[in-house]
């Protein structure tokens, strides 16, 4: 009788634990409000397109920064013709330094840097789009895309989107030949970038917040003139 009882308890515990992990594994990602893309060349070779979905309701300021830099045609203020300057296999690919093309530069649409918005979304799978930084509250324009789950980055870097299509391109970049600084020997270039789709915001508060963020960015740009 005791053996049956303990067997039942063990079975229940296993089922309970499985249910918890199953719930965690099936947790939904934040709503996607923008779809943008990068077309990538490795030297002169076209290697394809990366399509990214942005979490504009979860991280509206971070998304607005990335979105504006993606659609920009200003050669001094945008991702067009910038490079992926840091590539580490089984970790991530990093880009966004359009001022120095080395990892020491870049800037946001709100000025040089802006604060960490939140750490609600985790680096829990390949394809997470997250902000690179130099420490707390130092977000500029540099970003990275994970190629594996990176839980050690949680609470330190702001995740604001994910790769929807083109992980094959991400993995291609991940495996290009690099030098001792993890910089690709042959440049990996964003030869085209832009918007595929923006989802209208039904939530009035969210729409209002987005307009306020745009106004803040516009004011920051005006102050730099």
Swiss-Prot record:
It is an enzyme of class 5 (isomerase). GO terms for molecular function: cyclosporin A binding; peptidyl-prolyl cis-trans isomerase activity. It comes from the Eukaryota. This is Peptidyl-prolyl cis-trans isomerase D. The gene is CPR5. The keyword Isomerase applies. Glycans are attached at residue 139. PROSITE patterns: CSA_PPIASE_1 (PS00170), CSA_PPIASE_2 (PS50072), ER_TARGET (PS00014). PANTHER family: PEPTIDYL-PROLYL CIS-TRANS ISOMERASE (PTHR11071), PEPTIDYL-PROLYL CIS-TRANS ISOMERASE D-RELATED (PTHR11071:SF561). One of its GO terms (biological process) is protein folding. It catalyses: [protein]-peptidylproline (omega=180) = [protein]-peptidylproline (omega=0). A motif (Prevents secretion from ER) lies at residues 222-225. GO terms for cellular component: cytoplasm; endoplasmic reticulum; endoplasmic reticulum lumen. Keywords: Endoplasmic reticulum, Glycoprotein, Isomerase, Rotamase, Signal. It comes from Saccharomyces cerevisiae (strain ATCC 204508 / S288c) (Baker's yeast). Residues 1-22 form the signal peptide.
